[in-house]
Amino acid sequence: MLAVLLCFGLSFGLGLRPQTSNLVDSKGKKQGPWVLRFENGSKKSEGLFKDGRQVGRWVYFTEQGKLKSEMEFLVDTSFTNAKFYHPNGKVAGEGMYKNKKRHGRWFFYDTDGNLISEERYLKGLLNDTIKQFHFNGKLYEKWVYNQGLREGLWEQYFDSGTLKARGVYKNNNMQGHIAFFHSNGRLALSGFYENDLRHGTFTYYHEDGKVRVVLRYIHGELHPADRSKVQIPETKEYVPEEYLKEQFRQKGYSDY
């Protein structure tokens, strides 16, 4: 009889084992260790709360159990250090948040760990000089942002390091003279933009420096008299290529 009572008491005691995670205090604030899970039961995130605020290191996972990101919530501040990962475990991006908005310098990497872009943010908006890189590490492109708008000099480079293109932005629009170069350094194209539209004369050159064709534009439209001339691909050469960053975004590494 005593043995039965002891077993019953032991089982009852185990059933009343105090909860050690996902706690909420009398004021409704989350406290201590927390673990969140996906519907399939796999771990989604884990970390600490203090008075309802995330503190210290938090880890986030995909539904397949792979590490997705790490956040370091600095105690008693509005700053958070962040690091995101590719599915292969390589770092995809890293930087800092202030009040849950990107702030300061951010770095983005490809799946092999090569740096593909360096960006600067102010209160969640691109600000200052932004750089992108070729896979060989050389500078591919750089331009300047002012509170989320492109403003100032824009340049693009071949993977050899020589200049490929140069133009100027004003209030987020291409404005004024633009020039493209062949890989041998000779001028490939010279023209003008007005409020992000081709306007005026665009001169194309062969690699030996000889003029290939001259085309005239009026507020983005090719002059009727020039439509019968040699066909030149109608591309927005000046638009900065954001393919690599877009790939990063499409993989799901969005802000928390």
Short names for language-model regions:
Residues 1-21:
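Bacterial Sec-dependent N-terminal signal peptides
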Residues 14-256:
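Glycine/tyrosine- and acidic-biased, solvent-exposed loop/turn segments at the edges of beta-strands
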